[in-house]
């Protein structure tokens, strides 16, 4: 029996493999603290390892779910929703790549996403950081958001992600929000590198203007503790976004409770990982304050995905043990086995 998961965004080194050696021969049911058939925390023996490499939650929850006959979400708690909303996070800079087509290139991609069933889309912004001259980039960001809203109507959530594209440019970030006010931007993500002072100012400006746009951030923070200054004494980040693989199940569950207590929510970041989407779905199924997942529409040819189905903007999870995935052994042997690494 196997547990399947995904690493982070860098190759696994020999040093990392060496650190994982204590897992060899360990009873999977003793790697975590089990209470009433659920995972209640990390066992003391493996606590440091599992906090350092939180992405191990993926394969370990998959394995433990298969051993116990439970879906991964059921190892976290009761189901809190039957279907899990997902937004399309793949809309990038098509107007830049295909400059002869301009803004309509992005609009067409959004319309395609809506036809697929997505009721929320996230647009890449921040063109003035490096893709275009500063003022031209700001104008294009505004034009893209407003054109998309005109094309899709009021029923689709539009999120904006400058990827820190307004670094050292608070005024530019505010001009962006003013310029798209008519388009009802659902959230602004990573307008600039997170800072208590910066988000205190931005939060105040949004409130004074009577806007409803939320502040989202945190994909580069690896544990719940760094989020605390943004939750207390006043909530400065409305949507916390610790990466689903970087934080794994347990740290993301902990963070969701912190966010919920402050009146916010957690919608974990995910990029370039079909397993990451699936992990997010299992977390959302059991965590009340994780109301939505980021779908990057990734696929992996070596995976057989049996446990989830997308329809009309939401996913349903089948009652399959673990994450509901398996490896296509024929494809693995023909394409990937020669490059495998192992802990020994």
Please place each PLM-identified region on the residue numbering:
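Extended hydrophobic packing segments that form well-structured cores
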Residues: 323-344
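Metal-dependent enolase-superfamily TIM-barrel catalytic cores that perform enediolate-based chemistry
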Residues: 83-84, 88-205
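Conserved, mostly hydrophobic/aromatic
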Residues: 56, 69, 121, 161, ...
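Shared catalytic-loop signature of beta/alpha-barrel
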Residues: 22, 26, 184, 195-326
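Metal- or metallocofactor-binding catalytic centers and their adjacent structured scaffolds
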Residues: 2-68
């Amino acid at each position: 029996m196997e547990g399947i998961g995904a690493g982070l965004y860098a190759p696994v080194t020999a040093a990392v493999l060496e650190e994982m050696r204590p897992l060899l021969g360990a009873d999977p049911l003793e790697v975590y603290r089990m209470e009433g058939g659920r995972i209640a925390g990390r066992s003391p023996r493996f606590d440091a390892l599992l906090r350092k490499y939180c992405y191990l939650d993926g394969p370990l929850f998959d394995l433990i779910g298969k051993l116990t006959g439970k879906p991964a979400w059921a190892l976290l708690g009761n189901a809190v929703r039957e279907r899990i909303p997902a937004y399309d996070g793949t809309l990038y800079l098509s107007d830049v790549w295909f400059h002869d087509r301009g803004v309509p290139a992005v609009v067409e991609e959004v319309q395609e996403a809506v036809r697929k069933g997505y009721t929320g889309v996230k647009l890449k912004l921040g063109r003035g950081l490096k893709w275009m001259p500063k003022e031209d980039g700001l104008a294009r960001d505004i034009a893209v958001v407003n054109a998309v809203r005109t094309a899709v109507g009021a029923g689709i959530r539009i999120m904006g992600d400058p990827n820190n594209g307004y670094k050292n440019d608070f005024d530019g970030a505010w001009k962006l929000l003013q310029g798209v006010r008519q388009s009802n931007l659902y959230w602004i993500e990573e307008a600039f590198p997170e800072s208590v002072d910066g988000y205190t100012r931005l939060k105040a400006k949004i409130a004074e203007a009577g806007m409803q746009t939320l502040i989202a951030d945190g994909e580069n923070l690896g544990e719940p503790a760094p989020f605390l200054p943004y939750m207390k004494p006043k909530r400065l980040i409305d949507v916390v976004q610790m990466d689903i693989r970087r934080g794994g199940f347990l740290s993301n569950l902990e963070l969701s409770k912190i966010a919920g207590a402050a009146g916010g929510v957690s919608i974990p970041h995910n990029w370039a990982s079909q397993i990451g989407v699936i992990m997010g779905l299992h977390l959302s199924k059991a965590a009340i304050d994780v109301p939505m997942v980021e779908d990057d529409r990734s696929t992996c040819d070596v995976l057989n995905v049996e446990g989830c189905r997308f329809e009309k903007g939401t996913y349903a999870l089948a009652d399959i043990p673990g994450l509901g995935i398996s490896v296509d052994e024929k494809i693995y042997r023909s394409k990937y086995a020669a490059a495998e690494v192992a802990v020994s």
